[in-house]
């Protein structure tokens, strides 16, 4: 049996590389409700310096026909770890991919980046119109 620690790529890297935004049918499509997900360990790389950027992602959405599976979203956001991408672009791209996968009634993503060089950045993007719950 091959030791998973000596395989290249490692099992975690393979899981991230093969990740898809898996969704399942909304169990309560007739009821307005919100789902809130926080991902406190998001990382990507600065496109100018290549230094790592760290952020807390906060996703709030009102499901349409599909709900995103939690492990799938974790692996999906981990795929940005080695990508050189701006705060603004990564936040918009993640929202676009989640909207395409779930077709929500409303969705908002906030990326709260750790301060770097005495500058704190928060990027907030949304899609659709929020309904009362």
UniProtKB/Swiss-Prot annotation:
Keywords: Cytoplasm, NADP, Oxidoreductase, Queuosine biosynthesis
Keyword DNA-binding: no
GO molecular function: preQ1 synthase activity
Statement: the UniProt record of this protein carries the keyword Oxidoreductase: yes
Pathways per UniProt: tRNA modification; tRNA-queuosine biosynthesis
Catalyzed reactions per annotation: 7-aminomethyl-7-carbaguanine + 2 NADP(+) = 7-cyano-7-deazaguanine + 2 NADPH + 3 H(+)
Enzyme class label: oxidoreductase
Compartment list: Cytoplasm
Domain of life of the native organism: Bacteria
Active site: 46 (thioimide intermediate), 53 (proton donor)
Annotated binding of substrate, by residue: 68-70, 87-88
GO (cellular component) term, any one: cytoplasm
Chief place of localization: cytoplasm
PANTHER family found in the cross-reference section: NADPH-DEPENDENT 7-CYANO-7-DEAZAGUANINE REDUCTASE (PTHR34354:SF1)
Function (record text): Catalyzes the NADPH-dependent reduction of 7-cyano-7-deazaguanine (preQ0) to 7-aminomethyl-7-deazaguanine (preQ1).
Protein name: NADPH-dependent 7-cyano-7-deazaguanine reductase
Organism: Parasynechococcus marenigrum (strain WH8102)
Encoding gene (name): queF
């Amino acid at each position: 049996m091959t030791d998973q620690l000596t395989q290249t790529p490692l099992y975690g890297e393979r899981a991230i590389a093969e990740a898809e935004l898996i969704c399942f049918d909304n169990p309560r499509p007739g009821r307005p409700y919100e789902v809130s997900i926080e991902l406190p360990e998001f990382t990507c790389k600065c496109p100018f310096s290549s230094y790592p950027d760290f952020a807390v992602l906060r996703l709030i959405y009102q499901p349409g026909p599909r709900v995103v599976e939690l492990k799938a979203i974790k692996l999906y956001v981990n795929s940005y770890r080695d990508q050189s991408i701006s705060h603004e672009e990564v936040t918009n791209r993640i929202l676009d991919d989640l909207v395409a996968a779930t077709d929500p009634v409303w969705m908002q993503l906030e990326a709260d980046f750790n301060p770097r060089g005495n500058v704190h950045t928060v990027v907030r993007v949304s899609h659709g119109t929020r309904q009362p719950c």
